[in-house]
Amino acid sequence: MAGGKRYDGFAPGRHLIDAYGGGGFRFGDMSHKGSILMLPSGVKAWAAIDGQPWSASQFQDVFSEAAGVELLLIGCGVDIRPLPEALRWRFRELRIGLDLMNTAAAARTYNILVAEGRKVGAALISVD
């Protein structure tokens, strides 16, 4: 993904997603190859890969910021994949709503909800 500053794994603050595809994302005059978490504290590199099984450890950063996230949009890559029931219960316990969709839809929805001032986070798997 061309243009902007190189992203080193964490960018503080709220950022809108300017572009996605080509295996990465562009936001806040930065670009990142790979998956990302968009959280109240900032944007973080995320080790999730399209098609790999979901695990609680992938969402530890989200759990740590639960007070600032009422809704988590999960961009599952190209195809939507369900979360295991135990993981869904963990989100319920923390009162974080979930919406799973493909990454393109999640990125667009995230931008709209951030612009509205909502307490939203996004976990976005990169797509080509």
Regions found by a protein language model. Give the residues of each.
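Short, charged beta->alpha transition segments
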Residues: A56-F63, T109
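Mid-chain, well-packed structural core segment of small domains
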Residues: V62-D99
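Non-catalytic interface/targeting segments
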Residues: M1-A56, A115-A122, S126-V127
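A short glycine-rich beta-strand->turn/loop micro-motif centered on a GG-aromatic cluster
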Residues: G97-A107
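Short Gly/charged-rich anion-binding patches and loops
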Residues: Y20, A86-R88, A105-R108
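Conserved phosphate-binding catalytic cores of ATP/NTP-utilizing and phosphoryl-transfer enzymes
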Residues: T109-A115
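Short active-site-adjacent helix-start/loop capping segments
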Residues: A45-A47, I80-L83, T109
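Beta-hairpin (beta-strand-turn-beta-strand) motif
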Residues: I74-D79, T103-A104, I125-V127
